[in-house]
Amino acid sequence: MAEGKVDPVHQFTIETLFGTDHWSIGGYNIAFTNSALWMAITTAVLIVFVAGGAKRELVPGRWQMAVEGLTGFVDNLLQANIGKAGRKYLPYVFSLFAFILFANMLGLLPLALVGVHPFTATSHFTVTGVLAIMSFAIVLGVGFAKHGLHFFSLFVPHGTPVPMIPIIFPIELISFMVRPFSLGLRLFVAMMAGHVLLEVLSGFVISGTNAGVGTFFLAAVPSFLLMIGICALELLVAGIQAYVFALLTCVYLNDAENLH
């Protein structure tokens, strides 16, 4: 990277922290990377968060209230979209929602000030894609386990004229099959775009500061102020994207449970 230049996509580079390129199983590299590290940190934070709020105190503290509030939020989401049958999916959807939320938030921490460079795992499609495939696999498993081959009736909307079935069925099937792709892509694009924008603005700040007083006030100061606003927006996006992912998972589970 040239001096004074900022590479907007360098922050997404997967770097090996432990192991070598020769560490592989079945042709897949298993070296410990920065992505794996921050996913492990996210998982640890999630476990500590839940464990700390699991204490059933008569007068709940703030930690317990936070855990119960987040759990209640996800539970209401399931009830609203699936009904009473949605309660059994609470552990999975809660874990999914909290993991994405914490991963998004940890990637926004200003740890570079102390020499630590946070990594947003959800800015990689391999991560968001796996999360989406997990949800899709559960949807398929529930659908076929509960309805058998009748699950295919999901792709023929009620009241469809018989002559239209050969046309409607493949369209509905294709739209169903692309769900995991769109689910993972949405989260990946949202997180990557925000981080790239922040990096570009930081480049303007650095360049404007090095260019002179006039450029500093014309480019660096406005870019810095815009960065503050974008950071606040990114915090909002981090929560919204976790919510959208959980919401769509609930909607897809409802299709498997109730065939609509």
UniProtKB/Swiss-Prot annotation:
Q: Where in the cell is it found?
A: Cell inner membrane
User: Which Pfam family, an example, fits this chain?
Assistant: ATP-synt_A
InterPro entries recorded: ATP_synth_F0_asu (IPR000568), ATP_synth_F0_asu_bact/mt (IPR045083), F0_ATP_A_sf (IPR035908)
- Which CDD domains does the entry mention? ATP-synt_Fo_a_6 (cd00310)
Give the membrane topology, semicolon-separated if more than one. Answer: Multi-pass membrane protein
Keyword set, alphabetical order: ATP synthesis, Cell inner membrane, Cell membrane, CF(0), Hydrogen ion transport, Ion transport, Membrane, Transmembrane, Transmembrane helix, Transport
Membrane-crossing ranges are 30-50, 96-116, 125-145, 151-171, 187-207, 213-233, 234-254
Q: Which residues form a coiled coil?
A: none
State whether it acts alone or in a complex, and with which partners, per the record. Answer: F-type ATPases have 2 components, CF(1) - the catalytic core - and CF(0) - the membrane proton channel. CF(1) has five subunits: alpha(3), beta(3), gamma(1), delta(1), epsilon(1). CF(0) has three main subunits: a(1), b(2) and c(9-12). The alpha and beta chains form an alternating ring which encloses part of the gamma chain. CF(1) is attached to CF(0) by a central stalk formed by the gamma and epsilon chains, while a peripheral stalk is formed by the delta and b chains.
Xref: NCBIfam families: ATP_synt_6_or_A, PRK05815.2-4
* Family, per entry: Belongs to the ATPase A chain family.
Described by its record, this protein's role is as follows: Key component of the proton channel; it plays a direct role in the translocation of protons across the membrane.
Q: What is this protein called?
A: ATP synthase subunit a
Name of the coding gene: atpB
